[in-house]
Amino acid sequence: MESRKLISATDIQYSGSLLNSLNEQRGHGLFCDVTVIVEDRKFRAHKNILSASSTYFHQLFSVAGQVVELSFIRAEIFAEILNYIYSSKIVRVRSDLLDELIKSGQLLGVKFIAELGVPLSQVKSISGTAQDGNTEPLPPDSGDKNLVIQKSKDEAQDNGATIMPIITESFSLSAEDYEMKKIIVTDSDDDDDDVIFCSEILPTKETLPSNNTVAQVQSNPGPVAISDVAPSASNNSPPLTNITPTQKLPTPVNQATLSQTQGSEKLLVSSAPTHLTPNIILLNQTPLSTPPNVSSSLPNHMPSSINLLVQNQQTPNSAILTGNKANEEEEEEIIDDDDDTISSSPDSAVSNTSLVPQADTSQNTSFDGSLIQKMQIPTLLQEPLSNSLKISDIITRNTNDPGVGSKHLMEGQKIITLDTATEIEGLSTGCKVYANIGEDTYDIVIPVKDDPDEGEARLENEIPKTSGSEMANKRMKVKHDDHYELIVDGRVYYICIVCKRSYVCLTSLRRHFNIHSWEKKYPCRYCEKVFPLAEYRTKHEIHHTGERRYQCLACGKSFINYQFMSSHIKSVHSQDPSGDSKLYRLHPCRSLQIRQYAYLSDRSSTIPAMKDDGIGYKVDTGKEPPVGTTTSTQNKPMTWEDIFIQQENDSIFKQNVTDGSTEFEFIIPESY
């Protein structure tokens, strides 16, 4: 009997790629069958994913529908939990929110987050700042949550300083080692982890080659040159990088170093290809010429919130990174410029950045006058960039150096590529999503004025413009004084900024907005009540006049409004008044008695005559007017008092009408 072998194969990357694909579908809104409302935010997700990750959702979805509202958790915390469910990672959570995150994880039944406090309690510091001195690493079996705690050793042995263990990733990291480089920063009052600060670096005219300034890169396939980066956990949801020219560094030659730190550096080289999602931000500007293999310098006094993660695909021994301690106590001029800040939402994290050199060549980091680091995507990565939301042509302001700033303002261009899984509110503080209709369709509001509802907007440097084929589906909404223009799939809707009612006609919205502004007032002619709309006043005056305009065609009875007439037709005649056959007649409003007249010539000595029934007719010139008509002096100008006939014992009310407006009332029956 012939023996046969049974072959089994396991794809160790399948679970990660599957989870990444589900996260991308969530970002695009594909196949999402549940909406979770937390505070004022809506989160689209999949029931199967949430129920499999949370015992709370597993029990809730057995009885709940497609819309679920959570009142016991904040939106910021739920966004972190949802990102963990779809990425198996917790990314850059502030330490003051950690207790609330763990408590929310216990309420939702997310086991990993609920028991996250056990391994974290064994770490001496969670701030992420490097400290001098020896620290003991955690035992590999502490906390059975498959939590990987890595301790990196400095490649430069002359430093001799070790760095405390840093929690980098959670769950399986088989055949993957992440390279991290820790920047020791000085104390800073700014504790906002969601803001990234970079320094404005002027190009040096002369550079001296030294061991401290050269990143030696071997000519292996796919080498990677890495400049000043700090560790930060990356999230599958693409973030928005905040780059702010806040510091200015002097340009002596001896200060141009690769990394200016007061402590040791932390390097962790990747030994296997890592799967990266399209969480890339491209910032392309015309770089200044820099000698090869010489990287630019960064200041040694940087805010503690600078955290950049580099995840590179490379072969073993493909990159040799050299970094030593630089000169200490160098003078720096710190310039705060908040106007050039591109802020991000609290949910955002720092994007994955990498420098891509050419094959068999060396590549260095280059900076322009406004310190926009050139970051490109590795060509060997398979990333579906066609599913990304591209926002380009963001004009930057002039930097402190007018010559350099104006040059790159004309020549440079920043292209920001955002995956649609990001929170669109992270584009700026004033942005707000009003519609997410269809696949990969996002409509954003950029307020012009500062108001408490919409936040503070900086239109001069933050209004993006869509590019390419996405121009048809993704458009920006412009805010006016009284409304938003919401563009969805080519159709324009005008949304009132006060009550959020939508209109398809701008004139209808203008008339509606008078309810909030009261620019025009329509007082009742019979009492002291005032109305913001003319139709409101007309409906009210019907009760004074008792006029019955709605007449039933079946029996001839008249009614004061449509509701009474409709109930009469249904109950007495057993008919539907809103059907195809018209069962009632709407008579014109006779209380105003508007004259119907033809064109008047200047030679006419009379005005159109009016009978008692309110029907007017033209009076020929030179003929006697009929009995009951009034005459006027020749060449008398026509006024509103001539058109409207005053009722007996009624006082004349003269309304203050603004210039350019009329007093005609358009009565629309309720059945229309």
From Swiss-Prot:
GO terms for cellular component: chromatin; cytosol; nucleolus; nucleoplasm; nucleus; plasma membrane. There is a cross-link at residues 151, 153, 390, 407, 414, 449, 465, 474, 479, 539, 570, 582, 611, 618 (Glycyl lysine isopeptide (Lys-Gly) (interchain with G-Cter in SUMO2)). It holds the Pfam family BTB. Residues 325-354, 616-635 are annotated as: Disordered. Keywords: Activator, Cytoplasm, DNA-binding, Isopeptide bond, Metal-binding, Nucleus, Phosphoprotein, Repeat, Repressor, Transcription, Transcription regulation, Ubl conjugation, Wnt signaling pathway, Zinc, Zinc-finger. Residues 298-573 are annotated as: Interaction with CBFA2T3. Residues 514-638 are annotated as: Required for DNA-binding. SMART domains: BTB (SM00225), ZnF_C2H2 (SM00355). It is found in: Nucleus; Cytoplasm. Residues 1-136 are annotated as: Self-association. Induction: Induced in vascular endothelium by wounding. This effect is potentiated by prior laminar shear stress, which enhances wound closure. The keyword Transcription applies. One of its GO terms (molecular function) is zinc ion binding. A motif (Nuclear localization signal) lies at residues 471-480. Residues 32-94 form the BTB domain. Transcriptional regulator with bimodal DNA-binding specificity. Binds to methylated CpG dinucleotides in the consensus sequence 5'-CGCG-3' and also binds to the non-methylated consensus sequence 5'-CTGCNA-3' also known as the consensus kaiso binding site (KBS). Recruits the N-CoR repressor complex to promote histone deacetylation and the formation of repressive chromatin structures in target gene promoters. May contribute to the repression of target genes of the Wnt signaling pathway. May also activate transcription of a subset of target genes by the recruitment of CTNND2. Self-associates. Interacts with CTNND2. Interacts with CTNND1, and this interaction inhibits binding to both methylated and non-methylated DNA. Interacts with NCOR1. Interacts with KPNA2/RCH1, which may mediate nuclear import of this protein. Interacts with CBFA2T3. This is Transcriptional regulator Kaiso. It comes from Homo sapiens (Human).
